[in-house]
Amino acid sequence: MKKSGENPQLLETLSELYRYSGNRTCAGDGLCAMSCPMGINTGDLTHILRQSEFPPGSTGYRAGKFAANHFAGIKSTLRPVLSLANAAHSLLGTSTMTSITRKMHSAWGLPQWTPAMPKSYKIRKSDQTPAMNNKVVYFPSCINQTMGLAKDSPVNQPLVKQMLSLLQKAGYEVIFPPKMEKLCCGTIWESKGMLDIADSKSTELEAALWEASEQGRYPVLCDQSPCLHRMRATIQKIKLYEPAEFIYTFLRDKLEFTPTDRPIAIHITCSMRKMGLANILISLAKLCSTQVFIPEEVGCCGFAGDKGFTQPELNTYALRKLRPQLTKAGIGIGYSNLSLIHI
């Protein structure tokens, strides 16, 4: 229709409908390819379409380039914003804060706040573990370098501290990559269609991990499965692991597991499914609980990076079948290996 020039009014109507239904509310994670008999990844198409929205030289592209070149500063700026939001939550209360931010989202398209929004967090030099024979390079994701626990979180330590504690108990010395604050796997830019910027960040990260791992001598652990999925696609010469896989493969025999009888739910992320690691997460969960519940018909959670903030209706729809199952099964706590999913 675009080539022929026929019915331009219908073309504009269809294009506008697709902008929302096919682009803005596409998670872009490619999980659709696993259920498609032809293995078609519509997420790749979405990235290409988004790429055309941000051509080099456009305002959006220049903003993305600036963020990539000043990433440490961007994260430093985000931390006080999170602290301010947490202070407002404490002052106003959950109900009032939710009402105000929903109105702001509806009126101006500002990111939607939720009660599970985490506080700010920063890794300290004192967090590093002492010298040991076994070594692992730990690259905490951008999210976990910046975001800690929510105000009413049921746990008392951020993920990074928990991971460091486990590694130390198992006899592993942790090596952080040099200049970690400015590093990123590139998923942020890939999801926006800025593929060349994403690749440049991947190249930068690979060089830092190659140095930290002493040219691949030590394994590399990244604590977010979507980040690891991209890293495995772009970094070939280093052994890369996500937390459940690393714990189950290397730490299982070095730690003592005492399973609880409390039932727990497990959410398997899109990237874990695509990497074939779902059974490892389930097996690890079964070492920790005698009752592991896997919700049915809950695939992608719909958060998709920032979609849970900018298009919260996607998140709501994706998880519409979750709460009834948890209530029926009497599940009071759930686990996953992606911080944004916890939100």
Please state what every model-predicted region is:
Residues 1-26, 35-37, 42-45, 51-58, ...:
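Ferredoxin-type iron-sulfur electron-transfer modules and their immediate structural context
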Residues 13-19, 27, 126, 172, ...:
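Short, well-ordered helical secondary-structure segments
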Residues 14-28, 132-135, 155, 159:
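Secondary-structure capping and boundary motifs in well-ordered enzyme cores
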Residues 19-22, 28-32, 181, 297:
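Short metal-coordination and nucleic-acid-contact micro-motifs, chiefly zinc-binding Cys/His arrays
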Residues 29-35, 39, 188, 304:
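Cys/His-rich metal-chelating microdomains
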Residues 43-341:
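Iron-sulfur cluster-binding electron-transfer modules in prokaryotic oxidoreductases
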